[in-house]
Amino acid sequence: MKKEKTPPLSKNIIRLASLNIPGGGQITVEDGLAFVGHMDAPNGTSIIDVKDPSNPRILKQIFLDDELSHTHKVRVAGNIMITNVEQAQRHLLRRGEKLPDVSKQLALSLGRPPNDAEIAAALGLPENKLTDVRRFLNDGYNDGGFRVWDISDPSKPELLSYVRTHGFGVHRFDMDENYAYISTEMEGYVGNILVIYDLADPKKPIEVSRWHMPGQHIAAGEKPSWKGYKNRLHHALRIDNELWAAVWNAGFQVIDVTDIRKPKTIASHNYHPPFPEPTHTALPCEQLIDGRRIAVVVDEEHEHTPGQLHAFLWIFDVTDPKKIQALSTFNVSETESPWSQCKGRFGAHQFREKIDGTLVYVTWFSGGLRVVDIANPFLPKEVAHYIPPAPEQFPSPQ
């Protein structure tokens, strides 16, 4: 273990150990094992024994065959593990689909063929990414979906099936021992929708139903009232017979899955605009607080515009699904992290997707882990935090 040049900043949290592994997009911990979905190829998934938290031990690392995809999300139920397969650099490459038209327009306006610097500037892309864009336009992308693994022996995960979906492929998702609740693009729809798969035979997952917002199913004649794919499913989390769906710039919705074959929307709440950052996760607490059903919602920070709010945490009263009411918010000031002005994102991102008490464990990009007590839902209070130092060759912790 290396001695860090800059120590972590901490209150009421003690770090027991660390591992020098590539960054992850999701960590799932089950029965003393940590499953890490890595952000970038060739790193796929790491399975780590954390039964002794002071001495974590890597059991297995799964690597990817190419750099076209990343598998940065992972979940586990029993002896089954699911990893997503999503197009790497997806937003950048989707923007690059305009390259042929932009090149023609530039040629007409300039009176000559444009050079790469001019094309990249018109697309709003780094010039060194045009090679990737041209490869994508030539080859397309057909690998998006999810993989199902048998982890009876976590040191030797066995691939059981690979389900291909469409477009970008699969982003975040939820699962239990019966079903997978997948957020993915699908042919005929704009933006990610919910597709539910039966896992009774993990070697052959079977689609049982779909859910989307009105306006997404363009193949059926629906017309979105928004531009692009800004309104879409980020992911949905199951609690009892409900799925709590964060739908990006459309806020959050609650889906009844009492009949798994006919999911239906029973509640929705949208606070966009005026709040600029999209809704990342929504989830109710497992117990009532002062007789109220409370839900926690977090937005995800993107490129920050000065003068606008950073992404933050919301607390809602959802006792009456027809009258959802915001009770409070929790914010982290730029003054509370030495990396808030460094390159990279600062604001909120995600919380632990299980709220079994009044403590919410929520992360800020360069603002670190914040432990927030919502025992008084009108006045959330931070009780602990931990900000790791920036990794080598990175300007800030993310």
Feature-to-residue mapping (PLM):
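Feature marking well-ordered beta-strand scaffolds used for ligand recognition
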Residues: 1-101, 119-398
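Short, amphipathic alpha-helical "recognition" segments used to contact nucleic acids or chromatin
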Residues: 99-111
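Short, charged amphipathic recognition helices of the HTH superfamily
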Residues: 108-122
